[in-house]
């Protein structure tokens, strides 16, 4: 299924306080971008489904996006595609946007029927009619075509939904770490001895470790740099240089202390023996 027109994010079983502050800033920034591109509100699963189970607990544990964040450190979203309610002119509450899906009023129902008549030619609601059921006797059959309009976008709206949500997915991918070697200098100091200097930079938005949660989970490997074609005299052929911050760190520093330098680059140097130009 997919319905509701909302961007769901972690956490699922607990509140936002369980997320490290810097990760929370990133999640909120991604959510703002998603809201702008898709028109959907962004909310944690924990807030979107406040119903309690028979033991007085929220029944939202076990979400896949919570696992990908908690165990893999990946900022993940579950998109409930197709916002029928907003298309029909039904206003969503900011703090509980799924409520209009769970608790439909008579006024909302009339707006949905009007949308069906004016935008869909009335095809997605079947008028109730009697039917003789072999076991149940006389019954009535009719109502909404759930798969065609309630749980999925009608065909004439599908392309627009796909374009807006694909744009959000591409934008998320563009925010990942992006390691690059911006400058390399080679200084010849003897016939077969050279000093090599290289500036390693993270040009991406996220830090090289991805998220604070990835570091907590112990899966964020440090950046490694390796040289080939020469034998190091000073310096290692392959070395770990730790992690490099991304542009997201500048956002946090600006709010807290004003503009500052982001540690997103590392200058490395080797003395090597070899031949070449």
Q: Can you describe what each PLM-predicted range is?
A:
Residues 200-215:
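Short amphipathic, basic-aromatic surface patches that mediate peripheral association
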Residues 185, 226, 269-273:
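Generic structural detector for well-ordered beta-strands
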Residues 213-233:
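Extended low-complexity, serine/threonine- and proline-enriched intrinsically disordered segments
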Residues 258-277:
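Low-complexity, intrinsically disordered segments enriched in Ser/Thr together with acidic residues
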Residues 1-189, 194, 199-204, 228-253, ...:
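Metallocarboxypeptidase
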